[in-house]
Structure formats: C-alpha cells, structure tokens
Design a protein with these regions (language model features):
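Alpha-helical hydrophobic membrane-insertion segments
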Residues: 16-27, 153, 157-161, 167
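N-terminal membrane-targeting/pre-transmembrane regions
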Residues: 1-142
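N-terminal membrane-entry
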Residues: 142-156
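A membrane-cytosol interface segment of integral membrane proteins
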Residues: 218-273
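Conserved beta-hairpin
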Residues: 158-198
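Long, charged, alpha-helical interaction scaffolds
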Residues: 151-155, 167-173, 217-222
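Acidic, Ser/Thr-rich low-complexity segments on the non-lumenal side of membrane proteins
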Residues: 188-228
Length: 273
C-alpha cells in the first residue's frame, strides 16, 4: 500500500441485505394490516353474522314446526320478511353492504330447511359462493379495525424510514488517501486534524471512533467496518485496509485493546474473524 493510494469502502452486501430485509419485512406487515383493516376483518364479520343467521333460521323453523303443521307457504312468507342479523354500524361490515339484507334464498327453501341441519346448509351456501365456511369466534369491533389501520400506518412509516436510510447509505462511502479521510457524509478531514483514534471496539464489533478538530470546530468520525468495506478475506478485507491506511497517516493518540465487560461484548453483531 503506497502513501498516495486511495482506499474506498462502500456499503457491504451484509448491510444491504439486512437493510433490504427490514424494508421487505415491514412492507409485508403493512400490506397484511392494510388488508385486514380495509377488507379482511369486515369480510370475516360478514361471515360471522351470516352464520349466526343460519343458526337462528334453524331455531325459528324448529319452533314454527313444533306441531308438524308448518307449510312451505307459511315458511316462505315468514322467511321473506326476515333480515340477516347485521349490526347497524356499517363500518364493521363488508363494503357496499346495504341494510337490511334479506335472508339468503337457501334459508327460504322449505324443503332444504326441513331436515333442521343449518350447519350443512351453511357449508353448501359458502361452497356455492367460494368463501371460507369457518366464521370467527367473535366479530371484530370498529376499534379492532381502526387498530389495523394504525399499525399499517406505523409499518408504512418504518418502511419509508428504513428505505430512506438504505438509499442514503447505498450512495455513501468512506475513503482515505495520503492526506485526509473522507467520511460517509462527504466531509474531508486532514490527517493533521485527527486527535484521537479509539479502536477499543474495532476487534469485536468493527467500530472505530476518531475525534478531530479543524478550523470549523471539533467533531467525531464513526467508522463502521461491517457497514462500509467489510472484513471478507476474499475481498482483501477493505475495512482493515482502510484502518491500516488511517493508522499509517495518524499522528494523534490511539486507544486500543481495552477489555470489555462480558455483557458489553456479547451483545450486537461481532466483527468477522
């Protein structure tokens, strides 16, 4: 490595994969919560109340035919005046549900109701319409539906934040030449302005911190070798090469090889060996 050589460390595949995984994860969560808030819970409520109506219809038929004298005309007349037991709050029901909703035709059919098997009729009804025959144990409240929208909004915000940092990091790099170090923010700082190089976390976490003071004031540089450059030997360990370059040009105080408490050194990602 010559004195004039420039070492450039770009974002590592390790970081990009993790960041992209976070974006995808929260994106999937946002879609799932959106689906439940927009249609999922409301459709399940529709199934719940329809199923309850089938059970009630079976009970009504049994009571009216207790003496065995109920006629088909009497049942059709009664069933035609009945409505599905939907709540008045349309916000918890499937979109375009116009109340009142009359009983399905299958419940108005005397011959099909006569065996008093509402569960079988329910399965036939749902099979004909290609919907899930298993209703939820309890209906979802308006509050539960609002919560899906809230969590969807939170996940969407996290996607935007994570995506912002991912895009920003992809465009960044850390580099060092014979005169200065250029940080990931694009600030160029001469080696002569570097005061302290803290390497206590370099061996365990791939982190180093440099204090500097130039004409604009004091500051700190954070070098994350796992994010920029990496330590893969097949790539000639770009982060290590960058650090060797910095150390070869550094004339300030170096702090290194401190012993960490077990609880401190065990957490987080470790620098690859």
């Amino acid at each position: 490595m010559t004195a004039s050589e420039t070492i450039v460390c770009k974002p590592t595949p390790w970081f990009l994969f993790r960041a992209l995984a976070i974006v995808v994860m929260f994106g999937v969560f946002a879609v799932l919560f959106y689906r439940d808030g927009a249609t999922g819970y409301r459709k399940k409520n529709g199934i719940f109340y329809l199923n309850k109506t089938f059970q009630r219809a079976g009970g009504d038929f049994s009571k009216m035919n207790a003496s065995g004298t109920l006629t088909a005309a009497e049942w059709r007349k009664f069933a035609a005046t009945q409505a599905v037991d939907f709540p008045e709050d349309s916000s918890v029901l499937p979109a375009n549900t116009h109340l009142p909703v009359p009983w399905p035709a299958i419940l108005q059919d005397y011959e099909r109701m006569k065996p008093l098997q509402p569960n079988i009729l329910w399965r036939e009804y749902t099979k004909e319409r290609g919907v899930n025959s298993g209703p939820p144990e309890e209906p979802y409240s308006a509050q539960a539906i609002r919560e899906q929208w809230i969590v969807c909004g939170i996940c969407t915000l996290l996607v935007l934040v994570a995506g912002f940092f991912l895009i920003r990091t992809v465009r960044r790099s850390i580099s060092a030449d014979g005169e200065a170090i250029t940080t990931q923010t694009g600030k160029r700082i001469a080696f002569a302005d570097l005061k302290t190089l803290d390497l206590r976390k370099w061996e365990t976490k791939g982190l180093a911190f440099i204090d500097y003071e130039d004409k604009l004031g004091k500051g700190k540089i954070r070098i994350d070798g796992l994010t920029y450059g990496g330590f893969k030997k097949e790539n000639d360990e770009p982060a290590e090469r960058l650090m060797r370059k910095i150390r070869s040009c550094f004339s300030g105080e170096i702090i290194e090889y401190a012993t960490f408490r077990a609880s401190e050194s065990s957490g987080g990602e470790s620098k690859p060996s």
